[in-house]
């Protein structure tokens, strides 16, 4: 199958400024992410950034880079600009690989693109993995997803969904069967991506700070199978850097 990968990379991260250029194992993080994308079989890999410090480094290791507007609200909006700039067709499939995920298995990039290609009624595809601990279930930084019988997403939330009415607030004794954590990896058809970027954020998106709720609110279907491999540790805060370096060396 044919698909593209776009890697949105911002310099002005609130919690970790300059994050894409952090050195991990002798290479900037964005280079590790780019190498994962190249290994997945995509026909085209592009880094989308609003900062020349990132573009200069990326072009230095041979990446294709598109400089974008600095005022996009999300990575999806940034990739929509790239799709327009490069003249991608509306039926092209593009995978959004975040620039702070240097341990993403290449196989799941192919998996999410293939899931979208197979489900022609879906506007987007993403992935999930089973939740393994109550701590994950309660962590608002772990986004939960509930799905229907055909693996289409019904809702995403930072809250512990589905809520187990039988145990109420005594969540330490709840069953985690059927509970899933969302992986922030997306595939879109370019035509829908452009329409998505033109939509105003909905109240649910603004409340949860989850852009995929904009798509659900608009009536779009999101296919969400279980990932074939568990994704690696991302880099959100400075304490993640040492852990990721150890995993890269393993």
UniProtKB/Swiss-Prot annotation:
Native organism taxonomy: Bacteria, Pseudomonadati, Pseudomonadota, Gammaproteobacteria, Chromatiales
Protein EC: 2.7.7.38
Annotated GO biological process: CMP-keto-3-deoxy-D-manno-octulosonic acid biosynthetic process; lipopolysaccharide biosynthetic process
GO cellular component: cytosol
Stated family: Belongs to the KdsB family.
Function: Activates KDO (a required 8-carbon sugar) for incorporation into bacterial lipopolysaccharide in Gram-negative bacteria.
CDD domains reported in the protein's UniProt record: CMP-KDO-Synthetase (cd02517)
This protein's encoding gene: kdsB
Predominant place of localization: cytoplasm
Domain of life: Bacteria
Pfam families in the record: CTP_transf_3 (PF02348)
Keywords: Cytoplasm, Lipopolysaccharide biosynthesis, Nucleotidyltransferase, Transferase
Catalytically driven reaction(s): 3-deoxy-alpha-D-manno-oct-2-ulosonate + CTP = CMP-3-deoxy-beta-D-manno-octulosonate + diphosphate
Origin species: Thioalkalivibrio sulfidiphilus (strain HL-EbGR7)
Entry GO MF terms: 3-deoxy-manno-octulosonate cytidylyltransferase activity
Location(s) in or outside the cell: Cytoplasm
Metabolic or biological pathway, per its Swiss-Prot or TrEMBL entry: Nucleotide-sugar biosynthesis; CMP-3-deoxy-D-manno-octulosonate biosynthesis; CMP-3-deoxy-D-manno-octulosonate from 3-deoxy-D-manno-octulosonate and CTP: step 1/1; Bacterial outer membrane biogenesis; lipopolysaccharide biosynthesis
Class of this enzyme: transferase
Positions in coiled-coil regions: none
Protein name in UniProt: 3-deoxy-manno-octulosonate cytidylyltransferase
């Amino acid at each position: 199958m044919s698909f593209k990968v776009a890697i949105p990379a911002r310099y002005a991260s609130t919690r970790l400024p300059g994050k894409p250029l952090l050195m991990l194992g002798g290479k900037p993080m964005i280079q590790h992410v780019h190498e994962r994308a190249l290994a997945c079989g995509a026909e085209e890999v592009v880094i989308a950034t609003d900062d020349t410090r990132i573009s200069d480094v990326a072009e230095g290791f041979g990446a294709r880079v598109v400089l974008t507007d600095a005022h996009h609200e999300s990575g999806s909006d940034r990739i929509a600009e790239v799709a327009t700039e490069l003249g991608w067709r509306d039926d092209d499939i593009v995978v959004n690989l975040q620039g702070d995920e240097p341990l993403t298995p290449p196989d799941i990039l192919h998996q999410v693109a293939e899931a979208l290609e197979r489900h022609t009624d879906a506007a987007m595809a993403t992935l999930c993995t089973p939740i393994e601990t109550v701590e994950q279930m309660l962590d608002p930084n772990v986004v939960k997803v509930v799905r229907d019988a055909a693996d289409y997403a019904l809702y995403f939330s930072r809250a512990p969904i589905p809520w187990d009415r039988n145990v109420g607030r005594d969540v330490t004794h709840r069953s985690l069967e059927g509970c899933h954590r969302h992986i922030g990896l997306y595939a879109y058809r370019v035509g829908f991506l452009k329409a998505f970027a033109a939509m105003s954020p909905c109240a649910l998106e603004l409340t949860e700070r989850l852009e995929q709720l904009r798509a659900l609110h608009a009536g779009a279907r999101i296919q969400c199978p279980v990932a074939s491999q568990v994704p690696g540790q991302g880099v959100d805060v400075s304490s993640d850097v040492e852990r990721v370096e150890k995993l890269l060396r393993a």
